[in-house]
Amino acid sequence: MRNEELKDLFDQQAASYDKQWAGMAPIRDALYLLLDSLFAGLPENARILCVGVGTGAELAHLAERFPGWHFTAVDPSAAMLDICRQRATEGGFLSRCSFHQGYLDTLPAEPSHDGATCFLVSQFLLEPQARTAFFHEIARRLGPGAILANADLASDVESPAYEALLRSWMTLMSSAGVPPEALQRARAAYARDVAILPAQQVAGLIQAASFEAPVQFFQAGLMHGW
């Protein structure tokens, strides 16, 4: 799926996105709980880059948890970014946010950030070189000692365990209330439009972008966090 097709898809899904995936909140909340500890040592006035911020769930969580932080929200989908902006307005932290509609490479490299989140984004880059280049663009916008928290779907799709894990993941989504049509789209996307790679390979792509060796801090089903 090309960039514009992917952007159009998220534009179409923006209004119903949070409701559609609400049942998966326990996994999201577990990720955020560990994210808090990962970012706990950042400055009280840290600047955080949220790449592919979508409707702004992780931004809202961090804004409430760390009231002195400022955020740069980046997303190519105008509809998603509008919902993120509305969430910031309703949450009372709009003044601590700047919004950039577009892909990461169109965001100025300065000022630098103390941390970055990138959740379920890089997996849509099918070519390993493009994925490493994407992580390099994140690195260019981070200052010395900054921390990247990245999460993607990961597995060895050639292993016998993958089909069992995929079935379990689909059952989980179904029991969480994800509509059948969304499950069908997800299964098709995993085969065609998502680069599901072994966790060690994803970590290698991140490290190749000038980051230190990533440490995996999270896993729930297919979702891994480094």
Report each predicted region and the residues it spans.
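Conserved class I S-adenosyl-L-methionine
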Residues: M1-P43, H61
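A short glycine-rich, Lys/Arg-flanked "PGG" loop and its adjoining helix->strand segment in the class I
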Residues: T132-P144
